[in-house]
Each structure stands twice: as structure tokens, then as C-alpha cells.
Regions:
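Structured catalytic-domain cores with a bias toward divalent-metal coordination
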Residues: 1-274
Length: 274
């Protein structure tokens, strides 16, 4: 049910991993399904009569990436549990996902930073510096601005990411998981607020709204509160991964979880929320 691909070394030599999770049958037929997905992504030259059978045989491709910003630790720290759930759960919903979706996951888009942040936290836990920002950049060349490299691909990690989502897999939907401040909403999901860039296909923006509404609905159905959408984060931003993907016909989405102090608990009083 899982395939792990080492795309190569990061800027400082750590492995950049891509994991693919789906049903056992889909994993065994991954090359064929990848070919079908590429044909449907760019159907020029394919006979019209072949399109419907390809759609019937193909699978949805969804990509998610975690912790591009290394201090936003929740994404990467969550991936082992998510992977375990998808591989071991036997309920009908999980099986439906595995049967119909090829899930392409980048468990850490900045492996160097993740190692730095982990080392920094372990060094400072129990001291006055516990939970404070690391006093150097968590990427050798770009620091926090690695999220501005979704178009030029200057960083080797960006090259691996572009290879994954623009060449190898071309997903129908993509989510880039981040953290925001601690005293606002608990979780942001699309749709973005206005303005949005007008140059992508309008249907992609509508798909983003549909995905985000479904995520919010499922969370609130389970009793989660503080879900925000259509506010705070506009659809007109720098060309990071979630904002450049709509121009590749991919429903690119950002999530922002309420911020944390690494593994140290934080306490938010009701009057602090705004």
C-alpha cells in the first residue's frame, strides 16, 4: 500500500522523500495509472472516444506537502500517524480512499530545517530558550523564503517538488500545510478571500472552494471549532506552491493551523483570541 521514493539529497545532504499511498492493487499498477493520469491531464491528441474509459480506469491524484517552514512542525510530525491510519484502518471510508485515490505525500519539504529545529529544541528544552525561535535560518540559502520558490526553482528541494507535482504526478488537488499565529482561528482552509489572481481557469478556483468547504464541513461535523475560511489569506499572493499550482490546472490549497511552540504546550486564554 505504500511506496517510498528518495528524490535525492537536500541542500545539506538529508534525504528528500516522497511517499505514495494507495490500495495494494493501485500500487502494483502504479506505472499504468501514472500514464493514464498524464494522458488525462493533457488529452491533446487523444481520441474523444478514449477519454471516458480512461477516466473510468484512472484514479484521482492528491498531493500534500508538510512543514516547508521548519518551525511549523505540525505537518511533518503528523505524517507518521496519517500514514499509519491509511495503512491499517479497515473502515469503509479509508478503503474507499485507498481504492480511488493515489495519495502523493511529501512528509517534509524542508528536511534540513526539520533537523535543525529538532536539534535546537532538544538543546534548549528546560532552559530559558525553550520554545523560542532558532537564531539562524532554517534553510541554508533561503530561510523562511523557501516558500517564494514555486516558480523559479532555485533550491534543490524546489526542483524535487516541481518534478513531483508538475512532471511525475500532476495531481488534481494539492495542499500545502502551514502554521499561523496562536491567538486567532484554530485552522484556516480555503476558499481564499479576495482578491484572487484572474489568470487561472475559473473552474480551478471553484474547485478550491469546493474542496475547502468539504474539509470545513467534515471537521465541524466531528465537533471541531474555530475553522476559518474566506478570510485572512487572499488568493493573490507570492508564487509559493499553493498559489502557483492553479496555473498548472491544479487546485492548490493552503492550510494554516494555530501556531505552537514546537513540543512545548502553550496556553491561550479566551480573552487572547481575536
Amino acid at each position: 500500500k505504500i511506496k517510498v521514493i528518495n528524490m535525492g539529497p537536500s541542500a545539506e545532504g538529508h534525504p528528500f522523500l516522497v511517499t505514495i499511498i494507495s490500495s495494494e492493487e493501485n500500487i502494483n499498477n502504479l506505472d499504468k495509472l501514472q500514464k493514464i493520469n498524464k494522458m488525462l491531464t493533457d488529452p491533446r491528441g487523444i481520441e474523444e472516444s478514449l477519454i471516458a474509459p480512461l477516466i473510468e480506469e484512472g484514479k484521482a491524484v492528491v498531493c500534500q506537502s508538510m512543514s516547508l517552514h521548519a518551525s511549523e512542525v505540525g505537518g511533518t510530525q503528523m505524517t507518521p500517524e496519517l500514514t499509519h491510519d491509511l495503512l491499517t484502518r479497515t473502515d469503509s471510508e479509508t478503503q474507499r480512499i485507498l481504492d480511488n485515490v493515489i495519495f502523493v505525500m511529501v512528509p517534509c519539504l524542508n528536511p534540513d530545517g526539520q533537523v535543525m529545529i529538532t536539534d535546537w529544541y532538544r538543546e534548549t528544552v528546560g532552559t530559558d530558550y525553550e520554545g523560542l525561535s532558532m537564531p539562524w535560518l532554517y534553510h541554508k540559502y533561503s530561510g523562511h523564503d523557501n516558500n517564494r520558490d514555486g516558480d523559479y526553482h532555485n533550491l534543490v528541494e524546489s526542483k524535487y517538488m516541481a518534478q513531483t507535482i508538475f512532471v511525475d504526478w500532476l495531481p488534481q488537488a494539492y495542499i500545502d500545510h502551514h502554521h499561523m499565529g496562536s491567538t486567532g482561528a484554530r485552522f484556516f482552509v480555503p476558499p481564499y478571500c479576495d482578491p484572487i489572481r484572474p489568470y487561472a481557469d475559473p473552474l480551478v478556483w471553484r474547485e478550491i472552494s469546493w474542496y475547502g468547504a468539504h474539509i470545513a464541513y467534515k471537521l465541524e461535523e466531528q465537533g471541531f471549532k474555530g475553522i476559518l475560511n474566506a478570510a485572512q489569506f487572499a488568493g493573490w499572493g507570492h508564487f509559493g506552491w499553493h498559489w502557483i499550482t492553479p496555473f498548472h490546472n491544479i487546485a492548490g490549497m493552503l492550510t494554516e493551523s494555530a501556531g505552537v511552540n514546537y513540543a512545548t504546550p502553550i496556553y491561550i486564554q479566551p480573552e487572547q483570541l481575536r
